[in-house]
């Protein structure tokens, strides 16, 4: 009975997942989770360093197509969506995972740093969601999952562009959901807490800051990328068909303190 329930509500068999930034950190964890759940994958990466991720997917007997693109380029975004449909015929799940961060005090922040972060973290999310939602509307269904942050709720320090972009991601998640829910397209977001990735390595290396973070997390540990696997499958599967515009914090309790 449990196996039937799991298959009915959480299986992604025969689903096509389009994932950006899927060859490292949390993106790689999402990709592996999708492969475990039976989805076929179209993975957009900034570089061609995807051999390790490819092996992880193949270990799950999954099918993955890797596509290199610069997500600051509107035309390359458009072409990536066209290529996915050309290969698979459809897109059932979009995960806007690709992101970047630039750290510097506000008074020293450079214009190009601001633009770089907003282009990847916000503009690419908008363009991809717009392009893919048109396909999902024709299909009659779809899931769009954005990646928010604890800094979708807080101000942060020394990361003004990142904070602005992640507040905006939370906002457009709700805005998109308002328009797309009636088309059977669910738009939601995951807000990861403090996760062990390359982006957070400088913080973890700062003994004082690391202790401050751990002292605030009720779970008393940094998340591992695999801690996010369950949430991404939930939002990508039938189990979340009546969930719209929600920002799901997976944070070990960070926000409740």
For each feature predicted by the language model, list its residue ranges.
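Short C-terminal tail/terminal secondary-structure segment
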Residues: 2-8, 154, 233, 244-257
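Conserved glycine-rich cofactor-binding loop
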Residues: 16, 23-24
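Substrate-binding pocket helix/loop in short-chain dehydrogenase/reductase
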Residues: 105-106, 113-118, 213
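Active-site loop-to-helix junction immediately N-terminal to the catalytic Tyr of the SDR YXXXK motif
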Residues: 109, 155-163, 175, 200
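Active-site helix of classical SDR
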Residues: 129, 165, 173
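Residue(s) in the substrate-gating loop at a strand-loop-helix junction
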Residues: 149
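Short, small/polar-rich loop/turn modules that mediate ligand/substrate recognition or access, typified
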Residues: 181, 186, 243-245
